[in-house]
Amino acid sequence: MSAGRRSSGGRSAAAPRFTPPRGRAPLAVALDAPDAATALRWAAAVAPTVAVLKIGLELFYREGPAIVTALRAAGVLAGAGGAAVAAGGTGSAPELFLDLKLHDIPATVAGGMRSITPLGPRFVTVHAAGGAAMIRAAIEAAPDVEVAVVTVLTSLDVAALSAIGLAGPPSDAVRRLAVLAVEAGARTLVCSPREVRMVRMELGSNVTLITPGVRPAGSETGDQARTATPEAALVGGSDLVVVGRPITGAPDPGVAARAIAAGLSAAGRAADLL
């Protein structure tokens, strides 16, 4: 449905589709670090290049909100208003993506969203499987945050989905959950690069699509089941590609980030010619 689906309201319904600042790649680096010092080192290396820094469960559970404060103090993460400037960068520093995948009853998720809003994230993830009421509660509790609704984890293949009662190809579950999320008011979705083209065609151009499970050609897939290259994800309709280990596990994360950014830039130019 190229015209997109109507939502039930909320700030996310009016949020503009994500566009990286000038000079920054549509790339989020997953700071899945074992400690704050490692996260700060990785962030400093990639901050001049990328649009977003993603903090997930491992780092946030270990360090708590203090890691956000530390990244901002180091000048490698934008403030709540996006005003900080990264050393060596071209404009404001990367924005904050809290990938906490909230999934609970609506009141509890709403309370969680209110608790983390003061940290000034651009994105916070919740699970679509929590249902429409939970998604609406998250959006209403944090009107200044883009609630990014996770459809189906990129680690789940056909067999894994069948084992939890979701028979059929992953694309079917992704489509159902994406439509549910948008009808509940979401305007930012998380899906694998294998399904991003389908979701874009179904929901149109007014939805921000974030794609984890992205691996440069030749990289190990690890525990990811539904992957594609950064370039394929972008051409398929992704607005923000998430890359972790291929960057943070590289000998020089900054060089790795710049190489992926260059590939994304070339893919974007090629897509514009289609």
Curated annotation (Swiss-Prot):
<dbReference type="GO" id="GO:0005829">
    <property type="term" value="C:cytosol"/>
</dbReference>
<comment type="similarity">
    <text>Belongs to the OMP decarboxylase family. Type 1 subfamily.</text>
</comment>
<dbReference type="Pfam" id="PF00215">
    <property type="entry name" value="OMPdecase"/>
</dbReference>
<feature type="binding site">
    <location>
        <begin position="99"/>
        <end position="108"/>
    </location>
    <ligand>
        <name>substrate</name>
    </ligand>
</feature>
<feature type="binding site">
    <location>
        <position position="54"/>
    </location>
    <ligand>
        <name>substrate</name>
    </ligand>
</feature>
<feature type="binding site">
    <location>
        <position position="32"/>
    </location>
    <ligand>
        <name>substrate</name>
    </ligand>
</feature>
<comment type="function">
    <text>Catalyzes the decarboxylation of orotidine 5'-monophosphate (OMP) to uridine 5'-monophosphate (UMP).</text>
</comment>
<dbReference type="InterPro" id="IPR047596">
    <property type="entry name" value="OMPdecase_bac"/>
</dbReference>
<dbReference type="InterPro" id="IPR001754">
    <property type="entry name" value="OMPdeCOase_dom"/>
</dbReference>
<feature type="binding site">
    <location>
        <position position="215"/>
    </location>
    <ligand>
        <name>substrate</name>
    </ligand>
</feature>
<feature type="binding site">
    <location>
        <position position="224"/>
    </location>
    <ligand>
        <name>substrate</name>
    </ligand>
</feature>
<keyword id="KW-0665">Pyrimidine biosynthesis</keyword>
<dbReference type="InterPro" id="IPR018089">
    <property type="entry name" value="OMPdecase_AS"/>
</dbReference>
<dbReference type="InterPro" id="IPR011060">
    <property type="entry name" value="RibuloseP-bd_barrel"/>
</dbReference>
<feature type="compositionally biased region" description="Low complexity">
    <location>
        <begin position="1"/>
        <end position="15"/>
    </location>
</feature>
<dbReference type="GO" id="GO:0044205">
    <property type="term" value="P:'de novo' UMP biosynthetic process"/>
</dbReference>
<dbReference type="GO" id="GO:0004590">
    <property type="term" value="F:orotidine-5'-phosphate decarboxylase activity"/>
</dbReference>
<feature type="binding site">
    <location>
        <position position="245"/>
    </location>
    <ligand>
        <name>substrate</name>
    </ligand>
</feature>
<comment type="pathway">
    <text>Pyrimidine metabolism; UMP biosynthesis via de novo pathway; UMP from orotate: step 2/2.</text>
</comment>
<feature type="binding site">
    <location>
        <position position="154"/>
    </location>
    <ligand>
        <name>substrate</name>
    </ligand>
</feature>
<comment type="subunit">
    <text>Homodimer.</text>
</comment>
<feature type="active site" description="Proton donor">
    <location>
        <position position="101"/>
    </location>
</feature>
<dbReference type="InterPro" id="IPR013785">
    <property type="entry name" value="Aldolase_TIM"/>
</dbReference>
<keyword id="KW-0210">Decarboxylase</keyword>
<feature type="binding site">
    <location>
        <position position="244"/>
    </location>
    <ligand>
        <name>substrate</name>
    </ligand>
</feature>
<keyword id="KW-0456">Lyase</keyword>
<protein>
    <recommendedName>
        <fullName>Orotidine 5'-phosphate decarboxylase</fullName>
        <ecNumber>4.1.1.23</ecNumber>
    </recommendedName>
</protein>
<feature type="region of interest" description="Disordered">
    <location>
        <begin position="1"/>
        <end position="21"/>
    </location>
</feature>
<dbReference type="GO" id="GO:0006207">
    <property type="term" value="P:'de novo' pyrimidine nucleobase biosynthetic process"/>
</dbReference>
<dbReference type="InterPro" id="IPR014732">
    <property type="entry name" value="OMPdecase"/>
</dbReference>
